[in-house]
Structure formats: C-alpha cells, structure tokens
A protein has these predicted regions:
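Short amphipathic beta-strand/extended segments with alternating polar/hydrophobic composition
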Residues: 40-44, 61-69, 121-136
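Short small/polar-residue motifs
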Residues: 13-20, 35-40, 100-112
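Leu/Val/Ala/Ile-rich N-terminal alpha-helices, chiefly Sec-type signal peptides and the beginnings
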Residues: 1-23, 27
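Intrinsically disordered, low-complexity, charge-dense segments enriched in Lys/Arg
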Residues: 98-175
Length: 175
C-alpha cells in the first residue's frame, strides 16, 4: 500500500485535489476529493479492491472496476485520474489505449453476457482477474502488465511519457 502514499503526495502537491489515504490509518479506502461534491474512491469491499467515481456522495457496489489485486486497481485509478495531473503540470495529452480492438497481440478480453468484462488472458499464460463495467478500464492493463503503479505514475509525469508511454502521446484520456 506504499504506492497510495506516493500517489496521494503527488496528487496533493500538483493537482489541487485533496487525496486522503485511509488505508494508512487502518481504514479501507482512499478518497480523491475534486470539490463541489464530486470525487473518486478506491476501497476494499468483500475482498475486492474497487474504484469508481462518487456521485452525490455515493458509489455503486463493486465500482466501475474491481479486482482482488490492489495493483491492478491502482493502475486503473492512475489511468483514470492522470488527465488532471498532466493538465495541471501543463503537459500534452497522453492516454493509453481504451478500446477492445486496441489490445496488444495475443491478449484476449473475457466478457460476460451481461456486458461486464471479467478477465484478460495474455499470450504467455497471463491471467488478470477483475470485473469492469467497460473495456476502457481494462484494455490498458494488457499494455502495462509488467509495470508497477509507481512506474506508471512517474512516466505520466514526464512531458512525453518517457519510453513507457511515449507511443501514446496525443491519445485521448480515459474518462
């Protein structure tokens, strides 16, 4: 959970958001207050790490993305909130792929009949388990499979995204 302290420090310092890491104090969530009653949450619910936007002070059960892996959920949170950070730093638009047809070669997105995405399987036997309400939350996870949330956050803070993200300079953000 050390990454959440790093994330909170970066976002608090550079964005004007108020990020509170409750996990650090034994609570089960991280809150991102965007002001005017809006924000985002990363929380632990029934063994799943969930992420979603807060709407009128509430979030949907399970969030827009959930996984037993806190690292996967942290990457989704970073990809979702990075537009705020890059804008405040005066950096150009840089977003990772978000559409199912933009998966890297050999990766397959598993979908349920209820239009919920539940896993990504990679060409080398990789299996990422989650529940997502849209492909836009999980496609980037295939591209960023072997990248830590900290490496991802730091790459987003480079003007051109560095070697990790440079290829997507100018792509639209996840929103």
């Amino acid at each position: 959970m050390a990454f959440l302290d790093e994330y909170a420090a970066v976002m608090n310092r550079h964005t004007g958001l108020k990020v509170y890491n409750g996990f650090r104090r034994g609570h089960t969530g991280l809150s991102i207050d965007a002001g005017f009653g809006s924000g985002m949450l990363l929380w632990l619910e029934d063994g799943q790490y969930c992420f979603d936007e807060e709407e009128r002070g509430k979030v949907r059960k399970g969030g827009c993305f959930s996984s037993p892996s806190v690292e996967l959920t942290q990457k989704v949170m970073v990809n979702y909130t990075v537009s705020i950070l890059r804008h405040r730093l005066g950096l150009p638009v840089l977003g990772v792929p978000t559409k199912a047809d933009e998966l890297p070669s050999g990766w397959v997105l598993q979908e349920t009949p209820t239009w919920r995405f539940v896993a990504l399987d990679g060409p080398q036997g990789e299996h990422l388990e989650f529940a997502a309400s849209g492909a836009r939350y999980c496609v980037a996870l295939a591209w960023l499979y072997d990248v830590s949330p900290s490496e991802l956050l730091n790459a987003y803070m480079l003007p051109d995204g560095g070697p990790l993200l440079r290829q997507w300079l100018g792509y639209p953000y996840l929103r």
